[in-house]
Amino acid sequence: MVIATVAGFMLGGAAHAEEKLKVGFIYIGPPGDFGWTYQHDQARKELVEALGDKVETTFLENVAEGADAERSIKRIARAGNKLIFTTSFGYMDPTVKVAKKFPDVKFEHATGYKTADNMSAYNARFYEGRYVQGVIAAKMSKKGIAGYIGSVPVPEVVQGINSFMLGAQSVNPDFRVKVIWVNSWFDPGKEADAAKALIDQGVDIITQHTDSTAAIQVAHDRGIKAFGQASDMIKFAPDTQLTAVVDEWGPYYIDRAKAVLDGTWKSQNIWWGMKEGLVKMAPFTNMPDDVKKLAEETEARIKSGELNPFTGPIKKQDGSEWLKAGEKADDQTLLGMNFYVAGVDDKLPQ
């Protein structure tokens, strides 16, 4: 594959026969070898491996959300890509705008909720993995308090914090979670500073919804355990990582490209999780056998549908009742989640 630098971005792809389906990807960060963008790029490679000379792929990396995103999506559409994946929440409105201007192009937006005749939305139930992490954290923490590095206070991230909290409380009802927001999906410096600040505040477990390995490396340096994010980060902190929520986008990308090729593509809005294989857990490491066994059992129960992390009784942070015993949160509520559950030690930014 030819890689060329264009206007500060990396443009991957080689010119091949015109009849190939050209598939474009817009990335929030660099593909690198870890994290959110890495997993999307691995899925792109899986797409090429699965469909071979039927497809040609292109990507633009380090595309900022907002006006830059709209320009980049438009650029990649003008380049002849007929299927375009925009892989960050903040690309939603720019994707909607560009989709209107290119009705013959199919657009797929990750983690959002807006759709159009030629635009789908796809998301993963990351919160399912967060619940498993919470269970592990409560078993492994000696202090009963974990630190959580938040990226941007959108519902997806708030879901994860709350699910982590609920998983921990299923083991230790008095468990608490401290949160620091860095207001960025990828900023190694801020992520490292947040991890240090949380450890200084007394946490002995670190988890994150940010894209770099900075936090887990700080945890390693400070001698506490941590969780990876989006991909398996074990090689960066082999004695520190307990597990990671791993995003497996490959099967979805292959399915959608096949649909374009055979003419069956339709706009949809999907939210898949462990059951569908979009969310997986990295190997459970650096923990006693009994904790590993409980983690495996929890993962299996979520995957089978036996366990729904958002099942009452659950109280909000302010002490009010959210869900009665046995009551389950519906997807619409989760997709608009803008509050903490009880036990989270933070004021949610508005």
UniProtKB/Swiss-Prot annotation:
Q: What's one GO-annotated cellular component?
A: plasma membrane
Which Pfam families does the record match to this protein? Bmp
InterPro entries per UniProt: ABC-Purine-Binding, PnrA-like
First and last residue of the signal peptide: 1-17
As for what it does, the entry says:
Binds adenine and probably also other purines, such as guanine. May play a role in adenine and guanine uptake. May be part of an ABC-type uptake system for adenine and similar ligands.
**Which family does the UniProt entry place this protein in?**
Belongs to the BMP lipoprotein family.
Name used for this protein in its record: Purine-binding protein BAB2_0673
Organism (species): Brucella abortus (strain 2308)
